[in-house]
Amino acid sequence: MKLTPKELDKLMLHYAGELAKKRKEKGIKLNYVEAVALISAHIMEEARAGKKTAAELMQEGRTLLKPDDVMDGVASMIHEVGIEAMFPDGTKLVTVHTPIEANGKLVPGELFLKNEDITINEGKKAVSVKVKNVGDRPVQIGSHFHFFEVNRCLDFDREKTFGKRLDIASGTAVRFEPGEEKSVELIDIGGNRRIFGFNALVDRQADNESKKIALHRAKERGFHGAKSDDNYVKTIKE
């Protein structure tokens, strides 16, 4: 018997669903994986039987488990369950939205935030730098990118930005369209300030000596706004 990877996945799902069903019958509260497997396996089997439509199974999928059938917090983790099931007229995606209703209990790890603004990077001194995109393509900079090493087509005082990042929320970014000029706020990078990667201009501890090396590298590689002593000679073993 030769099975495709998809067929093997469905067999594994069937086994997991049957195991979850037996545990439910024993009164064992199901975890996340077991709950998803039970719902998915049931839909897959009913679709194969060919007596119910996809729409009917979407509704039926919401009746298989109650809040008391699963561990605390599991219901809130499962926003939807989607399974590609084989019907008599072909494969269809059956999506069950909110398959388990919440029981009103607190969700493990849930956060309740105050109804007020959150101050980010509080207590950190910020510097303002004017930046212009002299290139012909948009450039987007993430919150924790070492600003000194951003795209070479961004023109600004690179020395002023050494060891700094954008003063914006984590995971967000600032975008510069071609020819656009605007000011950004920067703060010091935290931690032990060992900067590696990015455009490989530093790759060491961020101190005054490494700043000189980085400026020299940036100027040699054509990064706009990088100024260094033309007579500078590296004296630090890299």
Curated annotation (Swiss-Prot):
Regulation: induction: By nickel ions.
Places the protein is found: Cytoplasm
Catalyzed reaction equations: urea + 2 H2O + H(+) = hydrogencarbonate + 2 NH4(+)
Reported consequences of knocking out the gene: Cells do not express urease.
GO biological process: urea catabolic process
Region feature (Urease beta): 103-238
Pathway(s) annotated for this protein in UniProt: Nitrogen metabolism; urea degradation; CO(2) and NH(3) from urea (urease route): step 1/1
GO cellular component: urease complex
Keyword tags: Cytoplasm, Hydrolase, Virulence
Gene3D superfamilies linked to this entry: Urease, beta subunit, Urease, gamma-like subunit
Cysteine pairs bridged by disulfides in the record: none
Main location: cytoplasm
Assembly with partners or alone: Heterohexamer of 3 UreA (alpha) and 3 UreB (beta) subunits. Four heterohexamers assemble to form a 16 nm dodecameric complex.
Family: In the N-terminal section; belongs to the urease gamma subunit family.
Remarks, miscellaneous: The novel dodecameric structure of the enzyme may allow it to remain active at the cell surface at acidic gastric pH. Within this dodecameric structure the 12 active sites are clustered within the interior of the proteinaceous shell. This may allow a high local concentration of ammonia within the enzyme which may protect the nickel-chelating groups from protonation.
Protein name from the UniProt record: Urease subunit alpha
Organism name: Helicobacter pylori (strain ATCC 700392 / 26695) (Campylobacter pylori)
Top-level taxonomy: Bacteria, Pseudomonadati, Campylobacterota, Epsilonproteobacteria, Campylobacterales
Gene: ureA
